[in-house]
Amino acid sequence: MPKRKIAPNKESSRRTVSHDDLTPQIQEFQNLMDLESQKVENIRQSYSRQNSLLAKDNSILKIKVNSLEKKISQLVQENVTLRSKTSISEAIYRERLSNQLQVIENGIIQRFDEIFYMFENVRKNENLPSSSLRTMLKRTSSRSRSCSLSSPTYSKSYTRLSNHENNLSHESSFNKDDGPDLEPKAKKRKSSRRQSMFVSTSLEPEDETGENEPMMENSSVEVPAESHESAQVEETIDALNPEEENSDSVSNFTNSIIEYSIPEENPTEPEHSSSKLEIFNDSTNMLSTVPSNPLPLPLPGPSATLPTTTSDASTVYPSSSSSTNSHPKTKIKHSMKPPRIELKKKVIDEVMPVSNMSSNSEISFTRTRRTRGKAVDYTLPSLRAKMRRPSEKLVDATTVIDIHDLQVSKRNRETSHKRKSLSQDSIPDEPQLREVVVSKDYGTPKGKKTEDEIHEDTAHLMTTSNNNSNNKNEKKLTSNNSPKKSSPLLDITNKSENKKKSTRTKKLFKNAIVNNLSDENSTTRPSKSSKGTSNNNNNYNNFDNNNSNINNVNNKSVSFRLNEDDLAVFDLFGNGKAVKHQPKTYRTKK
């Protein structure tokens, strides 16, 4: 039974094996197809990416190319503008250069024409044949004149060239006459440079206006610069023939042409120009006095050539001759300064003696001025400390007379009164030797007191005085107001009353010897001092009543002089109060 079962299984297995062999081949083929399709898709995607990238790059490159094209177009435009600018600048430069060259050529032609015109005038004055070279420049002379008159550079250079040609003509004349003499050349050159002559604007050259216009039509010859120079040399060689007066006339005419060519010349100033000629012009007639100049100087030549300037020349030449005749008076520019200095010196000499006298009069018042403002109020004790009270050493330093020899005692007081009465005229010149001085009016006679009245007054005042320090001050005022014939020094220290106080006080000299009778500053002080003493001291009321005769003497123009230090004594009194302590500023005993 088992054999029958195995046989069908083998047939089924064969069938399955044959079916399984076909499926993997199909699968492989299918896989290959899938792979190929994927490869194709990948390749297509890569190409699409590349195309997109290339498109972007192309767009960027196109933008850059457009910008570059714009820049190139701008650069091309700039290049065109620069080329146009350079061409325009070159054209402008060439035009300016041509204009300048034309102006220079016209000016040079005009100058040579005028130089030839001078030579032609010389030839006419000397009756010489005219030169053929002058006709070369006639074509452009009138046109160049119209151009050159308006240019300032032409006027400057023309004056230089005309002066140079004028100097050449003068040198040729001197070489003909003198030979190697050089000093007249320098003088003539100097004078020809400084000589000036005004010509009115109506002046026109006679030859030039008539000859220029027809020669412009006929002559058509171009003259180079070398021909101008050769013509100038030939004309200068031909100019060696004229004489000296002709050269003078030529110089005057060239200067007139110079003045004519300057348009800003004022024709209303002939007097001012003549004054300049009088001062600054050198002696133009020096050549006439040179011994090597035997030729005369006829004047009708220039007057014939210049008929319009005869009046001006007649005004200029006398001024120049007067300037040469009065050469030391007007030649010097600063000749007016020394009179000013002399006038100043004269004023100083007249004024200085007055100032010296005033200074000498002030010398005697120096000490009063120095102590003027100190004694203002005599009642204040603080001012007393400020006042200067020199000691005995300072008195010796300020005086040459011994103070002790000038003291007066009782026994020689009478002789001193007699001596004073005999020598009244000598008192004003003597210096005052003490603080209290009696100044007299010497023009009127005074009533004289006797010596008995003097002693009575002094005795009465001595009895009415107090026993304190006011005794000394009263003695001083009695000596002030006592007789006219009192001595210059009154003895104060050698009194019997003062001997009682010798133990308390050591007295010194009060003040130096100042002030004489001529001092006016101290004459106003006795009134102040008398008022101050009557107000501050009650003990002097009876003194004024008892001395009425002394007041009568005061009314007879007798001025008592007191120093400031005398009035300082009354500061001790105060307002009627007794002073306990006295300052040690008084004289000592002898």
From Swiss-Prot:
Its cellular-component GO annotations read:
chromosome, centromeric region; condensed chromosome, centromeric region; cytoplasm; kinetochore; nucleus; spindle pole
Q: Quote the biased-composition stretches of kind Basic and acidic residues, using this chain's numbering.
A: 11-20, 173-185, 448-459
Coiled-coil residues are 25-86
Q: Where is this region: Disordered?
A: 1-20, 133-235, 291-337, 411-550
Q: Which domain of life is it from?
A: Eukaryota
Q: What is the effect of changing residue 390 to H?
A: In sgo1-700; induces a lack of response when chromosomes that are not under tension
Where can this protein be found? Chromosome, Centromere; Chromosome, Centromere, Kinetochore; Cytoplasm, Cytoskeleton, Spindle pole
List where Basic residues composition bias occurs: 328-337
Q: Where is the composition biased (Low complexity)?
A: 302-326, 527-550
UniProt keyword terms in alphabetical order: Cell cycle, Cell division, Centromere, Chromosome, Chromosome partition, Coiled coil, Cytoplasm, Cytoskeleton, Kinetochore, Meiosis, Mitosis, Ubl conjugation
Record's comment on post-translational modification: Ubiquitinated by the anaphase promoting complex (APC) at the onset of anaphase, conducting to its degradation.
- Biological role stated in the UniProt entry: Plays a central role in chromosome cohesion during mitosis and meiosis divisions by preventing premature dissociation of cohesin complex from centromeres after prophase, when most of cohesin complex dissociates from chromosomes arms. Probably act by protecting REC8 and RAD21 from separase degradation during anaphase. Also acts as a spindle checkpoint component required for sensing tension between sister chromatids during mitosis, its degradation when they separate preventing cell cycle arrest and chromosome loss in anaphase, a time when sister chromatids are no longer under tension.
Query: What name is this protein filed under?
Result: Shugoshin
Q: Which organism is it from?
A: Saccharomyces cerevisiae (strain ATCC 204508 / S288c)
Please state the gene responsible for encoding this protein: SGO1
